[in-house]
Amino acid sequence: MTTQFACSGIELELFRYPSQQASNLQAWDAADEHLVKYLIDTEITATTTAILNDNFGALTCALTMQYPHSELLVETDAKTSLLGYQQNLLHNKLASTNIHWLNSRETLPQNIQLVLMKLPKNLHYFGQQLARLSTVLPAGTQILIGAKAKSINPALLASIEKNLGPASASLAWKKTRVISCISDGKKRSLAKAVSWNVDELKLTISNLANVFAANKLDIGARIMLDNMPKGEFKHIIDLGCGNGILGLHAKQCYPNAQIHFVDDSDMAIASAKHNWQANELDTPSQDLQSQDPQTEQMPQAFFHWDDCLSNLPADVEPDLVICNPPFHQGEAITDHIAWQMFVDAHKRLKKGGLLHIVGNRHLAYHVKINRIFKNCTTVASNGKFVILQAIK
């Protein structure tokens, strides 16, 4: 893995976040380089530039170095990306005083003069981002989108025009292209969150645009729901919660428990919180109700936008961690997220606490869990998925 970013006279040392990742993964790709090269070659300048989907800060750091007095509005849905930006700015001794941090649900400011963005893997989310931009960008604003050349096709360009304005792609460079879009000034309405019913659980689930499994239960979650651990648990973490379906069902299985929903995606956390409230699950049982009517009832759900369990309050000692680990980080296929989840779960579980996870068979999670917990049991399996359990 190289950490030396060099493009159009800009030199940086960049790391993924967390930095202890597989040596074959780096913190930027050729599309980042192409965007920087295109911007400098065409001498486009702006006093206020919005940056969207910058994986670990290559664009943010490059523009901070090249245009130190310009205002940057940097938006991300991923906590690890935000932490990566801050890590790389600090490492390269770049000031962040000109940067305003935005999450993926905040109202965009009206003063944006230029937009740089990477094409995300989730095209539904991409369409929503473009529609959000249309609500604030005046006609004539330029949007530059970096992407792999193989990802660009007439349907994508038509989608950009539908959601924001006419678009065209540059010549290929290092197997990437830069899409240039000019805002047409028309405000689009934003799509509503997708909702559906899980009849067997009597739950209604709603997903914001960047949440995995947009309109149905994924297969891994379904087998997990059918195989929740036996026993009574008081403090449960739904790690990598997505829309919160596992944590919601945990409340049904263990009605007196406190549930902590944790995810790297801000939209996932917002979806999980909405689903908890929409299904009216925050109704404490008699055991959790205060004897004093003047005292606020103890909440049963807590929501954490976090890099695994890195910033979970120190007083949270779970006796159960349930987890459906992702094996993608953006475009990269990697097992470091699952590894970090298992390590963090082992650190935070109380003695005798249980890790209960579902994963694809081919990922061989049992090997990793055994290394950390010194035990691992197969609870259930089918042709594709396996449910594993380990005790601290």
From Swiss-Prot:
EC number: 2.1.1.174
GO molecular function: 23S rRNA (guanine(1835)-N(2))-methyltransferase activity; nucleic acid binding
Catalytic activity: guanosine(1835) in 23S rRNA + S-adenosyl-L-methionine = N(2)-methylguanosine(1835) in 23S rRNA + S-adenosyl-L-homocysteine + H(+)
Keyword line: Cytoplasm, Methyltransferase, rRNA processing, S-adenosyl-L-methionine, Transferase
GO CC aspect terms: cytoplasm
Keyword rRNA processing: yes
Top-level division of the source organism's lineage: Bacteria
Principal place of residence: cytoplasm
Family annotation (Gene3D superfamilies): Vaccinia Virus protein VP39 (3.40.50.150)
Pfam families linked: MTS
Compartments reported by the entry: Cytoplasm
UniProt key word Transport: no
HAMAP family for this protein: 23SrRNA_methyltr_G
Chain's role: Specifically methylates the guanine in position 1835 (m2G1835) of 23S rRNA.
Similarity comment: Belongs to the methyltransferase superfamily. RlmG family.
Protein name (record): Ribosomal RNA large subunit methyltransferase G
